Design a protein with these regions (language model features):
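Feature captures the catalytic ectodomains and active-site-proximal regions of enzymes
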Residues: 1-158
Length: 158
């Protein structure tokens, strides 16, 4: 590693494959505060033109170094409990230590001095769940990172 941010610029790839601006890559993390993440994340959704074969594009994206997973909307809705009307045709998740960007020219990383961090990937889901009192946990099969806020709120209200 040479210290440069490890980024897969998905919009650039799709522009090369499908033509400029034919597809649209949306990164839910859009905060341009470069000290943290430079508007790069580990999760992206892609809107494809009607003429594109989503399965072929997914297969192609899945072969790109740094990409952990590419799934279609139906699978993303089930796997991540997402609203189908608010995500694109494909969902992309990057590997650990890799971020996803739209286009190289849309991410100004010149001011990046601190190590880059990311959000939204599967490798960032494990969060320590530490409490200072006993709480009644549900009979859920597995707690997830976003459950921490729910249980912290309940504990604080007592």
């Amino acid at each position: 590693s040479d210290g440069d941010p490890a980024v897969v610029y998905v919009q650039d790839l799709l522009d090369d494959w499908l033509g400029a601006a034919a597809a649209r890559v949306i990164l839910p993390i859009t905060d341009p505060y470069v000290v943290h993440h430079g508007a790069l994340g580990s999760f992206a959704t892609v809107y494809l033109p009607n003429s594109a074969n989503a399965a072929d594009i997914a297969d192609r994206l899945a072969t790109v170094d740094g990409i952990m997973m590419v799934i279609d909307r139906a699978k993303a809705v089930m796997r991540f409990e997402l609203p189908a009307d608010r995500i694109g045709d494909l969902v992309i998740v990057s590997n650990e230590n890799i971020t996803i960007g739209t286009s190289r020219d849309r991410h100004d990383l010149a001011a990046l001095k601190e190590p880059l961090r990311s959000h939204g990937g599967l490798t960032e889901q494990e969060v320590p769940f530490i409490v200072n009192r006993q709480i009644d946990l549900p009979n859920a099969p597995k707690l997830r990172n976003f459950d921490a806020f729910h249980f912290a709120s309940i504990a604080a209200s007592k």
